[in-house]
Amino acid sequence: TTVLDKSFRLPNKIANFAKSIVKRIDRRYEKEWSSRDDEGLLEYHTKFDYINMSKGEWLVLARTHYLLQPIEAQCRREGWFYSKNNVPSVRKSLITSIQDWEKLRKGESISSAAVRKMYQFFKSDGNVTKKGRGLKNVTEYETFSLQNLQNDYGLRTSGIWHEAFDNLSIYEREYMIALLRRGEKLTEEPRVRLSTIHAAKGKECQHVVLLTDLSRKAWTQMQVHENDELRTFYV
């Protein structure tokens, strides 16, 4: 068996931080290994607000789910595109429907499947009539222009998406507007990922934020089984 003695992922400062955790574990077989050649960057912050995640890829790790809640709230306030436990902060169907709506406004046509998906974001008897919303007798092979939908399928608007989609909550609408103003790339994977430590095992990222807070339950367990908690943070 060959034991690799060099990490090509961890820069020196991060490796030293990891070793400072693992050396506190009792009765552990000592493994000799070295880091990458570069130093890397390790910073300590007393508040999450001090971390600027407006650019680049980020992985935020917490011991338990509830510790991610205030981080998620800040991501929404700032207009950062994120995922929490692998679930994106914006529904893919909404992103696609906004793109399809803008196609209609430019004079293009879209499929009946795209129309059905898009119509869920209009209130029945709001910006589309109740009768038109049903799209009766429409086949999967048909395509529709904005004028078709206005003339025959109850559409009552041609405004920009955040005015037209009247079935969106204010909460979701304002967040989407903030994302677009920031220039977030919504057709790509979210650049900020929020995860528990356990769920993120093996993942890598350009920037990693490790929340060192513990729940009362985890703190109590640590008083009895400290090694288990140390292994969690080390991994």
Task: Set out the residue ranges of the language-model regions.
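The feature marks helicase ATPase cores and/or their adjacent C-terminal helical subdomains
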Residues: 1-235
